[in-house]
């Protein structure tokens, strides 16, 4: 006869707080700072979908309609940029072009600084 095995109890579970805390930082450019990178602004103005897919690809996310709030929130929390989901919602719904261009400019600058 075999002895009954004891169930395994998980005491700590990995989750959101298990990784290193992001460093606090700010956006590299302002929301309406279009002239700091005219190429990004022109791309967003004339081919918004292309820019949205490019940003999603940069973040290793899928390019689906309606994910802009989630991507902005993910990006902001990943880099410790202050704000809230409510802020992200308002920015992406009131000015989706400015929001998307700001994320792309930020990605480009962080890449140039090798912090992306």
Curated annotation (Swiss-Prot):
One GO BP annotation of this record: positive regulation of transcription by RNA polymerase II
Alphabetical list of Pfam families matching this protein: PLAC8 (PF04749)
Superkingdom classification of source: Eukaryota
Sequence similarity: Belongs to the cornifelin family.
Protein name in the entry: Placenta-specific gene 8 protein
Organism of this sequence: Bos taurus
């Amino acid at each position: 006869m075999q002895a009954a095995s004891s169930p395994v109890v998980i005491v700590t579970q990995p989750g959101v707080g298990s990784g290193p805390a992001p460093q606090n930082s700010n956006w590299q450019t302002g929301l309406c700072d279009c002239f700091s990178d005219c190429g990004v602004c022109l791309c967003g103005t004339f081919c918004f979908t292309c820019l949205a897919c490019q940003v999603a690809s940069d973040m290793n996310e899928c390019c689906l309609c309606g994910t802009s709030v989630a991507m902005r929130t993910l990006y902001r929390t990943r880099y410790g940029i202050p704000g809230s989901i409510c802020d992200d919602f308002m920015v992406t719904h009131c000015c989706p072009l400015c929001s998307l261009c700001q994320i792309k400019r930020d990605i480009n600058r962080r890449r140039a600084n090798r912090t992306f």
